[in-house]
Amino acid sequence: MRKLTYTLTAATLALMTIVLLRAQDPVKVDSKHYKVLFENDQVRVLRIHYAPGDKSPMHQHPDSVAVFLNDQRAKFTYPDGKSEETSAKAGEAKWTPAGAHEPENVGDKPLEVVLVELKGKVEKK
């Protein structure tokens, strides 16, 4: 019984480590696509640029607001292996809850976004 408990604990810790290593700060793991425009104690503002077909490694963001600078199509793959395609029009702004993903520009034009990451806890009303 102890051996089974030990094995399950070790497997759980290994899985958690893999997930944490895969979901990292996008600026650190993909500086080609993510640039910091502004940062203070409350927010970090990122400029995101993907050429057609570009893909990023798995990373995570806190709660954020995305402002789309052009019409675009993207595919997001999540840590559980599921994926979804999304589209946005130039000038749209969307709330994006905290989470990890692996984005890919599946459109035929560059993908340009300004992402405002919130550093504090978001109060639910």
Where is each model-derived feature located?
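A short glycine-rich, His/Asp/Glu-containing loop-to-beta-strand
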Residues: 30-57, 62-66, 116
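Short acidic-glycine-tyrosine-enriched beta hairpin
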Residues: 39-42, 80-98
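Bacterial N-terminal signal peptides
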Residues: 9-19
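Boundary at the C-terminal end of the N-terminal hydrophobic targeting segment
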Residues: 21-23
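Histidine-centered metal-chelating micro-motifs
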Residues: 53-56, 92-104
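Bacterial N-terminal signal peptides that target proteins for export
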Residues: 1-11
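Ligand-binding loop in jelly-roll beta-barrel domains
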Residues: 71, 98-121
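Glycine- and acidic-residue-biased ligand/ion/polar-headgroup-sensing regions
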Residues: 61-80
